[in-house]
């Protein structure tokens, strides 16, 4: 090997000597200095003697962590002495403050020369030394701040603004309850001058991410029963974004939470482990967990500050920062940093949706209880927008709404004191009367006011629209849209009670008004006619005694009679007459045992489903011929328990069974005559007589429900276990099982070792 030249060795020797000389001097300074800005940092090389001296001098009052707890090497991976110096040197000017306070930045800027060992200068001088001629051309400017920051905190702080602000605890002690339109924003949301000199005298530094206040890797979960999920989080002045990470490390937007949705923010745990627990507007939880307890505390405090400043419309709120210590000793006690917002006002948060563009113009949302047709209260999440009042299942806002009403056709909003409850109210629509109940009377009043305001705004917008369109007559302008929206609302309401027996709730529930045209009915105003489908009352114009089959009566009672329904109900039933919306197995499976015509149709559909597997695996022309014969009711081939109202009427009249019999006859003749389909039969594995069996021969054959094997009905009735299921269970046995099995013993002792999970049929 060629010897190294002196020029190749001298830079390394120079850096090494400079490094250790600076190390010795700064270690001496660190030991001599008893207190740095009121917070003491103890290097690990000093030993227990220095630690005991500092403790005796009372300098440990503000110590929050030692050793690796005061390092930033885990986040600032320096290329120089990364492994050796990690446990030796304290972090560069890392200020360790009490939770809930801000660091003394002025002292840090003025006494920069007296800080602890600054290893970044060495790294910078080593990096500034040119390595080659090309490096001289690519050499950049001097070191800029931000390189040694935590990878989850990228906030560029305007230090002049921060130095003028008061600490967080002082602000909470001095600032009274917010009144009026003025809201104090935190320092990171205040505008800064054009050129501000930072802590290192650099005036050319610009914010890399001006709209992102904090970002990093977190673990989130919805509640205590769910699993933690790793994600990448970004905190902006008005939203909290979560990105999912795939196997390649790519980030995809997972969910977006508006900061106005947060009702309370708490930091739970102790010094070793902490997590941020938040409660949203609909009482759902969102928990965040960071890499370290201090990172979790920083996330919680910064999230609270941004939530406090993001929505200036919440004027009647009281913001609190409480620290409630739990049981424990000294520094190991559990602390709960709670940042809460107590709301009192009409401005509500909108629902938490994965896509912020899914619903626009949300006015109010929350949990209300609706009186169902079974006369019980059921909780729903109601969302009020400028156009609709929607009801969702609790915690499932990403799904389609269960109920939807047009706000512009709302007739009245009034209190409901029939049950003696002061938090009940009614929302009257042309097609339905909603009886709702809130948690408190004040919450009910807020909902009533919001509904009235939304209805008035919707009506005024329609009037303004008519003026802008050259004053068209009301019957010509928007009449089609109004009828379309009304029909959609009626369809949604009637569809939810398709298989529910109707109950008459009385005229008082409708305020003695017709459910169709809102004309006064009852007493001297006219006769009220009840609709046997919905249970609502109508006038003589909206109810002309039309008769129709009631799906709920057929499903639950096998009542095949026709009953009088209103015009709206008849229109709806005719609209869904041929739609497969009724699942007998799900609604009332015992109906097959009580209705023989329906049981006969079930057996035919089971045979047809078995034949479908044969014909659809044959030539394409054969499958197309089967589709043509069954069109447009292909669900009869696949889902044997699904029926439409027309199918049920054909079952009652005895027309569906002959229709299915013709299709089965065509399919059976094809299987017996086709050279491909006829070879797909079964052999009875119990008797093994060689006869070819087919599963659609339901009279002479029986099929195993577990594996699908086909046997003779006489063989299966002998209570012999399925041979195929036995083989599959034995194949799952491990090798040690067969080694322990001694076939030389008696047969009974050997058979006791077999524990099979199949059903003994």
Swiss-Prot record:
Compartments (UniProt record): Cytoplasm; Golgi apparatus; Cell membrane
Origin superkingdom: Eukaryota
One GO BP annotation of this record: myoblast differentiation
Residue span, PH domain: 211-308, 361-456
Entry's Gene Ontology molecular function annotations: zinc ion binding
InterPro entries found in the cross-reference section: DEF8, PH-like_dom_sf, PH_domain, PLEKHM3_PH_1, RH_dom
This protein's UniProt keywords: Cell membrane, Cytoplasm, Golgi apparatus, Membrane, Metal-binding, Phosphoprotein, Repeat, Zinc, Zinc-finger
Main location: cytoplasm
Renumbered zinc finger spans (Phorbol-ester/DAG-type): 669-722
Phosphoserine carried by residues: 132
Pfam families assigned: PH, RH_dom
Family annotation (Gene3D superfamilies): Pleckstrin-homology domain (PH domain)/Phosphotyrosine-binding domain (PTB)
Cellular compartments per GO CC: cytoplasm; Golgi apparatus; plasma membrane
UniProt cross-references to PROSITE patterns, sorted A to Z: PH_DOMAIN
Assembly: Interacts with AKT1.
Function, as annotated: Involved in skeletal muscle differentiation. May act as a scaffold protein for AKT1 during muscle differentiation.
Protein's UniProt name: Pleckstrin homology domain-containing family M member 3
Taxonomic source organism: Homo sapiens (Human)
């Amino acid at each position: 090997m060629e010897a190294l030249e002196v020029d190749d060795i001298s830079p390394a020797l120079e850096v090494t000597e400079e490094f250790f000389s600076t190390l010795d001097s700064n270690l001496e300074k660190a030991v001599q200095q008893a207190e740095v800005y009121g917070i003491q940092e103890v290097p690990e090389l000093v030993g227990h003697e220095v630690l005991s001296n500092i403790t005796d001098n009372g300098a440990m009052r503000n110590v929050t962590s030692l050793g690796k707890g005061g390092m930033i090497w885990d986040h600032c991976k320096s290329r120089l002495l990364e492994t050796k110096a990690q446990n030796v040197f304290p972090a560069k000017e890392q200020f360790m403050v009490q939770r809930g306070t801000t660091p003394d930045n002025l002292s840090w800027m003025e006494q920069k020369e007296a800080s602890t060992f600054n290893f970044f200068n060495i790294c910078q001088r080593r990096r500034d030394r040119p390595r080659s001629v090309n490096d001289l051309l690519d050499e950049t400017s001097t070191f800029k701040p931000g390189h040694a920051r935590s990878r989850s905190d990228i906030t560029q702080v305007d230090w002049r603004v921060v130095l003028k602000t008061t600490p967080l605890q002082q602000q909470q002690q001095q600032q009274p309850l917010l009144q009026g339109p003025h809201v104090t924003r935190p320092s990171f949301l205040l505008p800064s001058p054009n050129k501000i000199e930072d802590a290192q005298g650099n005036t050319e530094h610009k914010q890399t991410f001006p709209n992102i206040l904090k970002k990093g890797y977190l673990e989130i979960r919805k509640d205590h029963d769910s699993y933690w999920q790793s994600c990448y989080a970004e905190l902006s002045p008005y939203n909290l974004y979560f990105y999912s990470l795939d196997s390649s490390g790519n980030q995809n937007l997972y969910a977006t939470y508006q900061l106005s949705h947060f009702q309370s923010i708490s930091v739970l745990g102790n010094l070793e482990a902490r997590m941020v627990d938040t409660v949203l507007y609909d009482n759902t939880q969102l928990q965040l967990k960071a890499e370290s307890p201090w990172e979790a505390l920083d996330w919680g405090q910064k999230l609270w500050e941004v939530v406090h400043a993001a929505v200036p419309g919440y004027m009647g709120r009281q913001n609190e920062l409480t620290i409630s210590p739990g049981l424990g000793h000294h520094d190991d006690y559990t602390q709960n940093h709670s940042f809460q917002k107590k709301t009192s006002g009409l401005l509500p948060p909108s629902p938490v949706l994965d896509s912020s563009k899914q619903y626009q113009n949300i006015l109010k949302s929350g949990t209300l209880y609706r009186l169902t047709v079974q006369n019980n209260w059921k909780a729903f999440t109601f969302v009020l927008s400028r156009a609709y009042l929607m009801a969702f299942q609790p915690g499932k806002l990403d799904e389609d709404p269960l109920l939807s009403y047009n706000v512009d056709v709302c007739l009245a909003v009034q209190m409901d004191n029939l049950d003696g409850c002061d938090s009940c109210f009614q929302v009257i629509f042309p097609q339905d009367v909603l009886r709702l109940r809130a948690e408190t009377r004040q919450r009910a009043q807020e909902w009533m006011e919001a509904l009235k305001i939304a209805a008035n705004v919707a009506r005024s917008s329609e009037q303004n629209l008519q003026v802008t369109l050259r004053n068209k007559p009301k019957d010509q302008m928007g009449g089609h849209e109004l009828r379309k929206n009304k029909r959609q609302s009626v369809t949604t309401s009637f569809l939810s009670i398709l298989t529910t027996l109707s109950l008459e709730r009385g005229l008082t529930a409708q305020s003695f008004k017709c459910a169709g045209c809102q004309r006064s009915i009852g007493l001297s105003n006219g006769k009220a006619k009840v609709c046997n489908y919905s249970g609502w009352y109508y006038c003589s114009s909206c109810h002309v005694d039309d008769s129709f089959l009631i799906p709920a009566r057929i499903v639950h009672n096998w009542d095949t009679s026709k009953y009088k329904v209103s015009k709206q109900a008849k229109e709806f039933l005719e609209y869904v007459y041929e739609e497969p919306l009724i699942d007998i197995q799900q609604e009332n499976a015992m109906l097959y045992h009580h209705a023989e015509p329906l049981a006969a149709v079930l057996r035919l559909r089971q045979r047809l489903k078995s034949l479908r597997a044969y014909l659809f695996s044959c030539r394409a022309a054969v499958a197309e011929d089967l589709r043509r014969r069954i069109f447009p009711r292909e669900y009869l081939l696949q889902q044997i328990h699904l029926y439409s109202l027309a199918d049920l009427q054909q079952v009652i009249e005895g027309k569906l069974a002959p229709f299915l019999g013709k299709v089965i006859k065509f399919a059976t003749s094809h299987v017996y005559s086709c050279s491909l389909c006829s070879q797909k039969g079964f052999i009875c594995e119990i008797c093994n007589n060689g006869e070819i069996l087919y599963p659609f021969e339901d009279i002479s054959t029986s099929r195993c429900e577990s594996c699908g094997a086909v046997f003779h009905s006489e063989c299966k009735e002998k209570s012999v276990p399925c041979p195929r299921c036995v083989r599959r269970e034995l194949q799952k046995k491990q090798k040690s099982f067969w080694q322990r099995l001694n076939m030389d013993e008696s047969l009974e002792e050997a058979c006791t070792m077999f524990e099979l999970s199949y059903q003994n049929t």
